[in-house]
From Swiss-Prot:
InterPro entries: AceGlu_kinase-like_sf (IPR036393), Asp/Glu/Uridylate_kinase (IPR001048), G5K_ProB (IPR041739), Glu/AcGlu_kinase (IPR001057), Glu_5kinase (IPR011529), Glu_5kinase/COase_Synthase (IPR005715), Glutamate_5-kinase_CS (IPR019797), PUA (IPR002478)
Protein name stated in the entry: Glutamate 5-kinase
Domain of life of the source: Bacteria
Lineage summary: Bacteria, Pseudomonadati, Pseudomonadota, Betaproteobacteria, Burkholderiales
Domain PUA: 284-362
Catalytic activity: L-glutamate + ATP = L-glutamyl 5-phosphate + ADP
Naturally occurring in which organism (per UniProt): Bordetella avium (strain 197N)
Gene name, Swiss-Prot/TrEMBL: proB
Length: 377
C-alpha cells in the first residue's frame, strides 16, 4: 500500500498566509466578518501548535468603499487611496476582534516598495516582524495603498506575500485564492484542463503555461502567483496555491493534507543580502552585456567588468541596484553598481586598466563585484 503524500506545510514552523479580497469581502459590500473570524480561528489553531504565522490580507479598499457608500470602484488614484485609508480602519478592527476571541493580539504592518528597497528600512521592518513573532503577536500585512503611486507599487499581494516570506525567512508561503490551484489551461475556458498538484517553483514551463511575462491576467490570474512562488523559493520557502473556499484549508495543510498545488523550492537559496538585492522591483537602470560577460557571470562566478558592457540604460548613482541583461534584453543578474551611469557609459567596452586614464581615478576595477550581484536567470 502506497502512503499518501504529505503536504510541505506540515513541517513549516514559520509561514506566511496570503488571503485575497474575494475571501474576506462580501461581494462588494465590505468585509465579511464571518470569513475574517474563520481565518482568525485557523491561524489561532496553528499558533497553539507552536507555529508562527504572518497574514497578508487584502480587503481595505473594498471595506472603505462600503463605509463611504460607494458602489463603483473609483478610477482616480486619490479616491482609491482615500478608500484604502478608511478601509484599513475596518480591516484592523475586524481582525483585532476576531483574534481577541482566541486570546491573540494583532499588529498592523503597512509596507511600500520604498520600505523594502531602502536597506536600513528593510532591516528595520525585518527586525520589527521578528520581534512581533517572538511576542506571539499575529502581524497583518498589507501594502500601504494610501501613499503609494502606480510607479512605486509592489503590484499585488501575491508579490507582497513572497517578499514578506523572504523578509522573515519563512518556511512556507500559502497563497489562498478562489480557485483550486494551478491548471495547464484556464479552467473557466477549458473545463478539461488538467490540474497540477505538484511542480517545482521556478519551472519556466509554468510561466509559459500561464501566458508569460506580458500576458496580464494569464490563466485565471495565476501568473503572479507562479512568480511569487519563484521569488519565495530563493529563500528556501515552499509555496502552496490553494482554494480559500476549502473548509479549514490552513489547518488541514498543517496536518499534512495535500490541498491545491504545491510548488517546491528547488532553486538556489540566496543569502539575506542577495535576497534583498533580488527583491528590488524598481531597478534604476540596465547594463547590456556581451555574450562573454553573460557567460562569465552565469558559469564562472566572475565580477562584471566594464569591457563586457555594450550599453548603459537609465540614470543611476553608485550603489544603486541595476539589472544585467543579454543582447535580447533577458535579465541574467542584478546588483549594486560601483559607478554612476554617466561614468559607466564612459568606461564601458574598456579594460579596467584604462579606468583611471578615462575618469581620473578608479573606484573599483569592476562595474559590479560578484559579492554584490545575484544571478536571476
Amino acid at each position: 500500500m502506497t502512503a499518501s503524500p504529505i503536504s510541505v506545510i506540515a513541517s513549516a514552523n514559520r509561514l506566511v498566509a496570503k488571503v485575497g479580497s474575494s475571501l474576506v469581502t462580501n461581494e462588494g459590500r465590505g468585509l465579511d466578518r464571518a470569513a475574517v473570524a474563520h481565518w482568525a480561528a485557523q491561524i489561532a489553531a496553528l499558533h497553539k501548535q507552536g507555529r508562527q504565522v504572518v497574514l497578508v490580507s487584502s480587503g481595505a479598499i473594498a471595506e472603505g468603499m462600503a463605509r463611504l457608500g460607494w458602489r463603483k470602484r473609483p478610477s482616480v488614484m486619490h479616491e482609491l487611496q482615500a478608500a484604502a485609508a478608511v478601509g484599513q480602519m475596518g480591516l484592523c478592527q475586524a481582525y483585532e476582534a476576531a483574534f481577541a476571541e482566541h486570546g491573540l493580539r494583532t499588529a498592523q504592518i503597512l509596507l511600500t516598495h520604498e520600505d523594502l528597497a531602502d536597506r536600513h528600512r528593510y532591516l528595520n521592518a525585518r527586525s520589527t516582524l521578528f520581534a512581533l513573532l517572538r511576542m506571539g503577536v499575529v502581524p497583518i500585512v498589507n501594502e500601504n495603498d494610501t501613499v503609494v503611486t502606480d510607479e512605486i507599487r509592489l503590484g499585488d499581494n501575491d508579490t507582497l506575500g513572497a517578499l514578506v516570506t523572504n523578509l522573515i525567512e519563512a518556511d512556507s508561503l500559502i497563497i489562498l485564492t478562489d480557485q483550486r490551484g494551478l491548471y495547464e489551461a484556464d479552467p473557466r475556458k477549458n473545463p478539461d484542463a488538467r490540474f497540477i498538484s505538484h511542480a517545482q517553483a521556478g519551472d519556466t514551463a509554468l510561466e509559459a503555461m500561464a501566458g508569460g511575462a506580458g500576458s496580464g491576467v494569464g490563466t485565471g490570474g495565476m501568473l503572479t502567483k507562479i512568480l511569487a512562488a519563484k521569488r519565495a523559493a530563493h529563500s528556501g520557502a515552499h509555496t502552496v496555491i490553494a482554494s480559500g473556499r476549502e473548509r479549514n484549508v490552513l489547518t488541514r495543510l498543517a496536518q499534512g493534507e495535500c490541498i491545491g498545488t504545491e510548488l517546491q523550492a528547488t532553486l538556489p537559496v540566496w543569502s539575506a543580502r542577495k535576497q534583498w538585492m533580488a527583491d528590488h522591483l524598481r531597478l534604476r537602470g540596465r547594463l547590456v552585456l556581451d555574450e562573454g560577460a553573460v557567460q562569465a557571470l552565469l558559469n564562472e562566478g566572475k565580477s562584471l567588468l566594464p569591457i563586457g558592457v555594450t550599453e548603459v540604460q537609465g540614470d543611476f548613482e553608485r550603489g544603486d541596484v541595476v539589472a544585467c541583461v543579454d543582447a535580447s534584453g533577458r535579465e541574467c543578474a542584478r546588483g549594486l553598481v560601483n559607478y554612476a551611469s554617466a561614468d559607466a557609459r564612459r568606461i564601458m567596452r574598456h579594460p579596467s586598466s584604462e579606468i583611471t586614464q578615462i575618469l581620473g581615478s578608479m573606484t573599483a576595477p569592476e562595474l559590479m563585484h560578484r559579492d554584490n550581484l545575484v544571478i536571476t536567470e
